[in-house]
């Protein structure tokens, strides 16, 4: 049993800094400003479910999928970096509102009638929480743990789902508490957080790309 607790603790120590639920909360605040409480709670729950599912797939089938499609870890990092940077640019330079012409009003009403955009999978679950770094760590750790012999087989079987569930629950709790943060900072504060997070996401995306390129250089040098 101590081996199980040790494995769970080690997994959380490795994954939580990469998943960084607090960063996802700040991103959520920037994207969910126009959502009501019910919709924010639904997005929070779905994001947590998606994070759990992504981590499970990455652990049990990640290497197989990447080998099947010929995807390397550097390629995963570069692709994730491009997605993160694109999302950051959209947050940093939001689309300007159209002039209040009859055509603009008509289009605004038409857009208002559409369902609220689903932000649970992209960008909250991926790449913000279960991003390329998290997925790469899970895939590499899965290979190391299975062949390392440090833990008994039953621990290797039981611990990963518990670790991933714990990360998902922590994320859900953080996102659910974002409503109190929204009431505290107000609309202006949310816009400021959105711009700041956009800039940070662009920086993160560029860094992901740099890391991927450096890994390629090291691999083929």
UniProtKB/Swiss-Prot annotation:
The listed locations are:
Cell inner membrane
InterPro entries reported for this sequence: Multi_antbiot-R_MarC
**Entry's transmembrane regions:** 8-28, 46-66, 69-89, 119-139, 155-175, 197-217
Quote the cellular component terms of the Gene Ontology held in the record.
plasma membrane
Q: Name one Pfam family in it.
A: MarC
Q: Which residues lie on this side of the membrane: Cytoplasmic?
A: 29-45, 90-118, 176-196
The chain's Periplasmic topological domains, given as residue ranges, are 1-7, 67-68, 140-154, 218-221
Per UniProt, which keywords does this protein have?
Cell inner membrane, Cell membrane, Membrane, Transmembrane, Transmembrane helix
Entry membrane topology: Multi-pass membrane protein
Q: What is its main location?
A: membrane
NCBIfam families documented for this protein? NAAT family transporter (TIGR00427), PRK10995.1 (NF008228)
Which family does this protein fall into?
Belongs to the UPF0056 (MarC) family.
Question: What name does UniProt use for this protein?
Answer: UPF0056 inner membrane protein MarC
Q: Which organism is it from?
A: Salmonella arizonae (strain ATCC BAA-731 / CDC346-86 / RSK2980)
């Amino acid at each position: 049993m101590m081996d199980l607790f040790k494995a769970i603790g080690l997994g959380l120590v490795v994954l939580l800094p990469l998943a960084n639920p607090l960063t996802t909360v700040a991103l959520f605040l920037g994207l969910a400003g126009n959502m009501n409480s019910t919709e924010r709670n639904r997005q929070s729950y779905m994001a947590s479910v998606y994070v759990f599912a992504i981590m499970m797939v990455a652990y049990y089938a990640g290497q197989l999928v990447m080998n099947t499609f010929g995807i390397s870890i550097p390629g995963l990092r570069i692709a994730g970096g491009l997605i993160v940077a694109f999302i950051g640019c959209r947050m940093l330079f939001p689309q300007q509102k159209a002039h209040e012409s009859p055509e603009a009003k008509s289009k605004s009403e038409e857009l208002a009638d559409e369902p609220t955009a689903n932000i649970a999978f992209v960008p909250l679950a991926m790449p913000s929480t279960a991003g390329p770094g998290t997925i790469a760590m899970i895939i590499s750790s899965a290979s190391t743990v299975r062949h390392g012999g440090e833990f008994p087989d039953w621990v290797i079987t039981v611990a990963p789902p518990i670790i991933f569930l714990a990360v998902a629950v922590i994320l859900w709790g953080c996102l659910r508490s974002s409503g109190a943060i929204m009431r505290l900072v107000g609309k202006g504060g949310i816009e400021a957080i959105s711009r700041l997070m956009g800039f940070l996401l662009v920086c993160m995306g560029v860094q992901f790309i740099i890391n991927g390129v450096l890994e390629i250089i090291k691999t083929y040098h």
